[in-house]
Regions:
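Pro/Ser/Thr/Gly-rich intrinsically disordered low-complexity regions
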Residues: 16-46, 88-90, 94-96, 103, ...
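Generic structural signal for alpha-helix starts
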Residues: 79, 304, 413, 652-654
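Beta-strand-connecting loop/turn residues
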Residues: 52-54, 129, 159, 210-212, ...
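Active-site-adjacent bridging/hinge elements
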Residues: 35, 118-120, 268, 330-334, ...
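Exposed acidic/Ser/Thr-rich ligand/metal-binding surfaces
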Residues: 59, 124-131, 135-152, 161-162, ...
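Subset of Sec-pathway N-terminal targeting signals
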Residues: 17-255, 488, 499-501, 545-567, ...
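Sec-dependent N-terminal signal peptides
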Residues: 3-13
Length: 736
């Protein structure tokens, strides 16, 4: 019998006659030498970060599912480069001594585990040290509680700090962790600007200018990677951080540039103008209208004293509260509340008149002007042709007015609303029937209530930045940040010039940057860039029509970076079927089409692909929301939008997901196909079948020689026993 390796609890099992480490209980048969896997039932981490020092407390509950009393080792891989200053361990509440092993000794242990367990998962950590603790006894069918506290210095580059936390993750369909939670209390000595987690979706709550909490909670948790957090401090109005990824110096690199205002105490309070344009047609009757009224009341209560505002309701015709923008005063707010209370849902939908009325005020606006546009329908009065309506609104809006759209329900024209936000550099939001309008609008309004810098423009001097997403830069608000992902050529020192307006006056900021000539760090930047690129192209297909050139580029990028969504999966399967039919690729070189689940899921994926062309309905709303998430992707979960719709039941009755067979290693995707992991870099070669292959048997002397001579192979080898990958210009194939 083969026992799998547990990343954090390794149980060395030998026969009774060897070292008497296990005493089996009759009538249990004597186990064979090997490794048991303890089930990790719960995981809790609490972290206190004080500028550049972190104290991490990890509590884990492991379950021994056997009827045997076991001896084993608890092993905890340390973050790469971590300088652990002190640590303590507790077993079931009793403090116990452990040992701290350097990377060399740890690698020897990892390799020995691979030899005995025939499971290469730990090779991913072969360059890292570890904490090890002997545990005895581990009682049968009982929970083993382990608590670990350690302190270490954070990695730092300039004024950007990074924190890493090892998480239990595997590549072979691990059992989910019943409960998982992480809470970070972050304190800094200077103004805290960027807070960024690329690996998981987290909640970030700022508590003043120098403190924040970061965390997540999950049930049935499965982690695809370790946890990483970046944060940046800066005493000035704006902060910036740059992350480069460039594994090959001969090729263009990838960059992630983040700009943030933080909650800077001395940031100037920028006055804004805002118009609330609300659909009051008959279809908005009932609960929808009441929620819309509540949302408007919330926004009115949170206007700044120096703001100007107006309310416009529209049905068969448009009616404004004021003739134009008016100051925030007690009298005007009282009129506004009465205007909201008197709203009734009746009549048609005259979008043209309402939006043109709101845009008229742009002539008098000498500061940021926002329009919040809420509707649940399509234009039925006035200009009803979407393209003509967009032309009229575009001619009226010179580009200074931001239109933020809220589509309510599923019967709206998503293409119209999305194009409206695109041409005005706004943002789109949808409220499904089961969602609350008030919550969606109020959450959004709090984010835009305090603009810091508007009408942004940027350029980089010293290196060439290209293929940057998003294509247009949004305004920057207090407590918020925005990021740009792109490619670059050249390297070394560069300068970012950022210009914008603060209270109607032009301001220019310059930031020093340094782009790496070659670096293996920050490999997540490549798939995030891939997600934004694919999202942008899918939006072009949605809004402007499909073309072979666009589809081919979506397929290429999605394959390379593992952007597996219901939309891209169908396009990949369709493309591979064509390639196989023309004998351009072998079946073992396909990524999705030859997987049974890929073929069975194809009809469902086709429905999703059809949603790209539909301009209304639930599927169209979902496509708009998911693709916008891809357009602004800044964590790995956003590279697989719509993942829940890729679920299926395998022949054994187990719940699976098509995306589970995709992992990112060294900035590109690896695909599990019929038991073998295949590197997308091989599959995307023009003639992959003609490439020279180095064949190596798993767990052989040559296998460990490859690991020692080419340490970069560890990440690929950790995927499993059967892998084919490209490294240093050569193809390596490991097989049992």
């Amino acid at each position: 019998m083969k026992y799998l390796l547990s990343l954090f609890a390794l149980l060395a099992i030998t026969s009774l006659s060897a070292q008497r480490l296990i005493i089996p209980e009759p009538p249990m048969p004597r186990p064979q030498p090997g490794l048991f896997e303890l089930e990790l039932q719960s995981y809790k981490a609490e972290v206190e970060i004080d500028q550049d020092v972190a104290v991490t407390t990890v509590e884990q509950d492991f379950y021994n599912p056997t009827s045997l009393q076991l001896q084993g080792y608890f092993m905890y891989p340390l973050p790469e480069g971590a300088n652990v200053q002190q640590f303590s361990m507790w077993i079931n509440g009793k403090e116990t001594k452990g040992e701290l092993l350097d990377a060399k000794k740890a690698r020897e242990i990892y390799e020995e585990i691979v030899r005995k367990a025939l499971d290469p998962a730990l090779l991913e950590y072969s360059k890292q040290g570890l904490l090890r603790l002997r545990i005895f006894p581990i009682q049968p069918r009982s929970v083993q509680k382990i608590k670990l506290v350690y302190q270490h210095q954070l990695s730092q580059e300039g004024n950007t700090y990074s924190y890493a936390l090892p998480l239990y993750h595997r590549h072979d369909g691990q059992k989910p962790i019943e409960r998982a939670a992480l809470a970070i209390d972050l304190k800094t000595r200077e103004s805290l600007k960027t807070i960024y987690c690329p690996t998981q979706e987290v909640e970030i709550i700022r508590k003043g200018d120098r403190r924040a909490t970061v965390g997540f909670e999950a049930e049935k948790a499965v982690f695809a990677s370790d946890f990483e957090l970046f944060f940046q401090t800066d005493p000035n109005l704006l902060g910036h951080s740059l992350l480069s990824y460039r594994p090959e110096s001969s090729e263009d690199g990838f960059f992630f540039l983040n700009l943030s205002s933080g909650l800077y105490d001395e940031a100037p309070l920028v006055a804004k103008d805002i118009a609330f344009v609300v659909d009051a047609s008959g279809s908005m009757s009932g609960e929808k209208m009441q929620q819309a009224k509540n949302a408007l009341t919330f926004c009115l209560e949170h206007l700044n004293p120096q703001d100007r505002f107006n309310l416009i309701r529209f049905s068969t015709e448009a009616n404004g509260l004021f003739d134009g923008l008016k100051a925030v005063s007690k009298e005007n707010l009282a009129k506004a509340r009465g205007f909201v209370d008197d709203m009734e849902a009746i009549g048609g939908t005259n979008m043209e008149e309402a939006l043109l009325m709101a845009l008229e005020s742009a002539q008098e606006a000498d500061r940021p002007y926002f329009i919040i546009f809420l509707t649940d329908g399509k234009p039925t009065i006035g200009e009803t042709q979407p393209e003509q309506l967009l032309k009229k609104l575009g001619a009226k809006n010179t580009g200074r007015v931001r239109i933020f759209t809220f589509g309510v329900g599923t019967e709206i024209n998503t293409h119209l609303l999305d194009k409206l936000t695109e041409q005005s550099r706004g943002y789109r939001t949808y409220v499904l029937p089961e969602e609350d309008i008030e919550i969606k609008v109020s959450d959004f309004y709090l984010k835009v209530a305090h603009p810091v810098l508007t009408d942004l423009r940027w350029e980089v001097e010293g290196v060439k930045a290209k293929e940057v997403y998003p294509k247009t830069i949004p305004d920057l608000f207090k407590g918020s940040n925005f990021s740009m992902l792109g490619r670059y050529s050249g390297s070394g020192k560069a300068t970012l010039k950022l210009t914008g307006k603060v209270n109607g006056k032009d301001r220019e900021f310059t930031f020093p940057l340094e782009f790496a000539k070659q670096t293996d760090e920050n490999e997540f930047v490549a798939p995030l860039w891939g997600s934004r690129s694919v999202g942008y192209l899918l939006d072009q297909i949605r809004l402007n029509g499909e073309s072979k050139e666009l589809v081919d580029e979506v397929v290429r990028l999605a394959k390379k970076y593992g952007i597996i969504t219901p939309y891209t999966s169908y396009l990949i399967i369709e493309d591979e079927a064509e390639q196989l039919g023309m004998n351009r690729i072998r079946r073992d070189e396909s990524l999705l089409s030859q997987r049974v689940e890929g073929r069975t899921q194809a009809p469902k994926m086709k429905e999703a692909e059809d949603d790209l062309a539909n301009d209304s309905g639930r599927g169209s709303v979902r496509a708009s929301e998911e693709i916008q998430e891809m357009n602004y992707a800044d964590n790995m979960a956003q590279t697989q939008m719509g993942r829940s719709r890729l679920e299926y039941t395998d022949p054994a009755g187990r719940q699976r997901n098509l995306a589970d067979g995709v992992m990112n290693v060294q900035g590109r995707a690896q695909y599990l196909n019929n038991g073998q992991w295949l590197d997308s870099a091989i599959a995307l070669q023009e003639n992959p079948g003609r490439m020279t292959v180095n064949h190596i048997q798993f767990n052989s002397p040559e296998y460990f020689q490859l690991l020692r001579e080419r340490p970069a192979s560890a990440e690929f080898l950790a995927l499993g026993r059967n892998v084919r990958f490209l490294l240093d210009g050569q193809v390596w194939e490991v097989a049992e």
